[in-house]
Amino acid sequence: MKFLTQKTDALSRASGCSVVFALDNALLTTALALDDALGGVLSQVIKSGDLKAKPGQSCWIPVPAASGVKAARVLLVHLGETSEKKSKIASGSVISALQSAAAALSASPAKDTTVFIDDLFADGAPTIEHFGEPADASWVAEQMAKLFVTASYRYTETFSKPEPAPALGKVTYASDDATRTRAVKSALLKGAAIGEGMNLTRQLGNLPGNICTPAYLVEQAKQLAAACPKLTTKSLNEKQIEKLGMGAFHSVAKGSDLDAQLIIMEYKGAGGAKSQPHVLVGKGITFDTGGISLKPGANMDEMKFDMGGAASVFGAMKALIEMDAKVHVIGVIAAAENMPSGRASKPGDIVTSMSGQTIEILNTDAEGRLVLCDTLTYVERFKPKSVVDIATLTGACVIALGNHATGLYSNEQALADKLLAAGVGANDRAWQMPLWDDYQKQLDSNFADMANIGGPAGGSVTAACFLSRFTKSYPWAHLDIAGTAWQSGAKKGSTGRPVSLLVNYLLNA
């Protein structure tokens, strides 16, 4: 999808659609101009109550040929109501309105559209408040591009008669202010790149486990590298993983007939030969049965999403490539299946991790931390500035935080603060959880250095405590995305989170 900026007006702009906005019970500037040209039909929609003052409510307005309006159609979208004596509008209302516009246009025959959201920055307009801070036109443009790109995503891979792709291919951000027009250009590029990264993450997550295997992820890494000279990739197979002494990782992989893979992608958009990279580590369990500690059958199909951490690393890399980001990032994926078999690990088995620490496997369904702990040891060789692991790690995090916030743990507060700020800026928030020594005792084992579970109390915290024992040599953060990586129910599918958070962090790290 192509994004442009242009100084234009809704009357003379020829496009498939003009998107204009209402706020409170009034039309914004461009909508008012169109209302005059179209005989008051927009204001009538407001007065009649057909378009309610709720964020995201929208209405198609017919454009008669004799009106002089060059757009083929008009979409009127409501931004909701202002607050504090009409001086502020919540950023969430703006997001809802843009989301609604993107969804409507992706389902329409319009091939291009012009969006007049810049009316929110006219003199006397209310301030857009984003978690206590004012949001500028660049932030709005970034969110707009991201939302339009993600609205265009369709999962078609395994349908015999796939749904056709949306017609929309070009979106123009209209503004009559030259300074703002220049400012939003890079924001549109960033938002579109993040949207493309999120769509890759969604696609990988949505694929079934019989297609998206560890070997398939290796091929995806090769495809990214083939398209970008700044990205190199390599992978280690299961024998090489075992030879490195990654006993925890191998204990998970050995139950499957499919070879595990450790995938390394290095994007070098900045820095010399000795520059320290930021490292992303993704949990890539392409299907999780629970192993010998078998999961219940209900909803087990959703365990194809257990590689959401790996998918988000791919998505972040894709976004960095798309925007030609000036950063040095290494993404490492621990890819395996967790399957029951005669070779699979059993509850009570004890393995030696790459770090030399021994682990009693009390539950084979706590496998994510086993593949991650060895990968976190492996990445020490890169002498990283920071390491962020991303994993659909615990159901306990879903109980604690639901499906809105990603759980964040860190051994360095400065790193945690950067990630929290990145999440707020990207509208992809995380919430910091405790990583206190008090919880470490729950991992005690009578037979090994530690157990791989710490009991039901504070399960997300003890999982993070387990990982923290393998991250002593660098600043580290853990993102538990079990509640945010996918949706269940009628809208079942990968969300593309936390790609926005990760990219925002890496660009400002």
From Swiss-Prot:
<dbReference type="InterPro" id="IPR011356">
    <property type="entry name" value="Leucine_aapep/pepB"/>
</dbReference>
<feature type="binding site">
    <location>
        <position position="367"/>
    </location>
    <ligand>
        <name>Mn(2+) 2</name>
    </ligand>
</feature>
<dbReference type="Pfam" id="PF02789">
    <property type="entry name" value="Peptidase_M17_N"/>
</dbReference>
<comment type="similarity">
    <text>Belongs to the peptidase M17 family.</text>
</comment>
<protein>
    <recommendedName>
        <fullName>Probable cytosol aminopeptidase</fullName>
        <ecNumber>3.4.11.1</ecNumber>
        <ecNumber>3.4.11.10</ecNumber>
    </recommendedName>
</protein>
<dbReference type="GO" id="GO:0006508">
    <property type="term" value="P:proteolysis"/>
</dbReference>
<keyword id="KW-0963">Cytoplasm</keyword>
<feature type="binding site">
    <location>
        <position position="288"/>
    </location>
    <ligand>
        <name>Mn(2+) 2</name>
    </ligand>
</feature>
<feature type="binding site">
    <location>
        <position position="288"/>
    </location>
    <ligand>
        <name>Mn(2+) 1</name>
    </ligand>
</feature>
<dbReference type="InterPro" id="IPR008283">
    <property type="entry name" value="Peptidase_M17_N"/>
</dbReference>
<feature type="active site">
    <location>
        <position position="295"/>
    </location>
</feature>
<feature type="binding site">
    <location>
        <position position="367"/>
    </location>
    <ligand>
        <name>Mn(2+) 1</name>
    </ligand>
</feature>
<comment type="function">
    <text>Presumably involved in the processing and regular turnover of intracellular proteins. Catalyzes the removal of unsubstituted N-terminal amino acids from various peptides.</text>
</comment>
<feature type="binding site">
    <location>
        <position position="283"/>
    </location>
    <ligand>
        <name>Mn(2+) 2</name>
    </ligand>
</feature>
<dbReference type="InterPro" id="IPR043472">
    <property type="entry name" value="Macro_dom-like"/>
</dbReference>
<dbReference type="InterPro" id="IPR023042">
    <property type="entry name" value="Peptidase_M17_leu_NH2_pept"/>
</dbReference>
<feature type="active site">
    <location>
        <position position="369"/>
    </location>
</feature>
<dbReference type="Pfam" id="PF00883">
    <property type="entry name" value="Peptidase_M17"/>
</dbReference>
<dbReference type="GO" id="GO:0030145">
    <property type="term" value="F:manganese ion binding"/>
</dbReference>
<dbReference type="InterPro" id="IPR000819">
    <property type="entry name" value="Peptidase_M17_C"/>
</dbReference>
<keyword id="KW-0031">Aminopeptidase</keyword>
<keyword id="KW-0464">Manganese</keyword>
<keyword id="KW-0378">Hydrolase</keyword>
<feature type="binding site">
    <location>
        <position position="365"/>
    </location>
    <ligand>
        <name>Mn(2+) 1</name>
    </ligand>
</feature>
<dbReference type="GO" id="GO:0070006">
    <property type="term" value="F:metalloaminopeptidase activity"/>
</dbReference>
<feature type="binding site">
    <location>
        <position position="306"/>
    </location>
    <ligand>
        <name>Mn(2+) 2</name>
    </ligand>
</feature>
<keyword id="KW-0645">Protease</keyword>
<keyword id="KW-0479">Metal-binding</keyword>
<dbReference type="GO" id="GO:0005737">
    <property type="term" value="C:cytoplasm"/>
</dbReference>
